[in-house]
Structure formats: structure tokens, C-alpha cells
């Protein structure tokens, strides 16, 4: 999320101009600690409705780094609005996910549009969460301005 961008910030070198990498199992954990200390010192808190990532300190950041190295992956951010769209697209297909997992859908679309993901690339998107914030999709669909909203009929 743009409002909770820990992995993207560290992986893309947006903190101290150093790109955090898995480094064959030897990631610079001191960089992670300094990043968290910086957030605390500046009083910076994640700003997202996606409750699964509001903590801003991913419990599995090292697993994420390992996966990025293994897959030659990239890290990007998407807005809360985009995550809601992604969550709704999943819902339109009869499945269910929570808001942060909606980032998977729109993140892939964003990377395709930026031509980072090419037409013939193999892409695997993993949605790790199920719908736990039941009112988020209800509120999304009540607002007909949302891209994929299906408002209730009276």
C-alpha cells in the first residue's frame, strides 16, 4: 500500500539509498532496524484501511525478500482505492479476499501497464487473506462512483 510501504521502501532503496536484498540468506537486518527506528522517531504510522498491513512492520519481511530473490520479483505500491478495486474484482468472480490481498490483483495490473510484466511472462498472484472486514465491500458497493461497484437495488 502507498500508505504502508515498508517492503517497497526498503527493497527499492527509498530509505538511506540502500536496496534491501535477501542476499543469499544474509539480508541487512540492521537496515530494517534503522528504518523502524526512523518511523518511531518521526512518529510515522501507516495510513491505510487495509488492517492486515496497518502495522507497518511486516512479520514475514525476510520471507518476502527471499521470495523476491527466488522469483526475480519486484516490489511496488498501490493506493487504498486501488486495493478496494482489486478486492472487488476478486469478489465479482465469486471469491473472497480482504483488502490487502486486493493489492495483488491491481499490483499485477499496474506492472503489466508499466510493461514490467510482459505479455508472455508467467505470473503467480497470491492472496493470503480472507474477508475479515465485512463492511469494507458493503461500503465499496454502496458507492456507485467506485469502478467495480454493483450498488444494491431498492
Q: Could you tell me what each predicted segment is?
A:
Residues 84-111, 121-123:
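Substrate-binding/catalytic subdomain of NAD(P)-dependent oxidoreductase enzymes
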Residues 1-97, 140-154:
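Active-site/ligand-binding loops adjacent to catalytic centers
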Residues 105-154:
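Catalytic phosphate/nucleotide-handling subdomain of diverse soluble enzymes
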Amino acid at each position: 500500500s502507498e500508505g504502508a510501504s515498508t517492503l517497497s521502501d526498503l527493497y527499492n532503496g527509498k530509505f538511506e539509498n540502500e536496496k534491501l536484498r535477501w542476499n543469499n540468506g544474509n539480508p541487512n537486518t540492521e537496515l530494517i532496524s534503522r528504518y523502524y527506528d526512523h518511523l518511531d522517531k518521526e512518529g510515522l504510522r501507516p495510513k491505510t484501511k487495509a488492517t492486515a498491513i496497518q502495522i507497518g512492520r511486516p512479520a514475514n519481511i525476510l520471507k518476502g525478500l527471499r521470495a523476491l530473490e527466488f522469483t526475480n520479483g519486484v516490489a511496488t505500491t498501490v493506493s487504498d482505492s486501488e486495493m478496494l478495486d482489486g478486492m472487488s474484482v476478486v469478489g465479482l468472480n465469486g471469491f473472497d479476499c480482504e483488502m490487502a490481498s486486493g493489492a495483488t490483483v491491481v499490483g499485477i495490473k499496474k506492472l503489466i501497464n508499466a510493461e514490467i510484466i510482459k505479455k508472455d511472462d508467467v505470473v503467480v498472484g497470491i492472496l493470503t487473506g480472507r474477508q475479515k472486514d465485512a463492511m469494507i465491500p458493503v461500503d465499496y458497493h454502496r458507492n456507485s462512483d467506485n469502478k467495480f461497484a454493483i450498488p444494491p437495488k431498492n
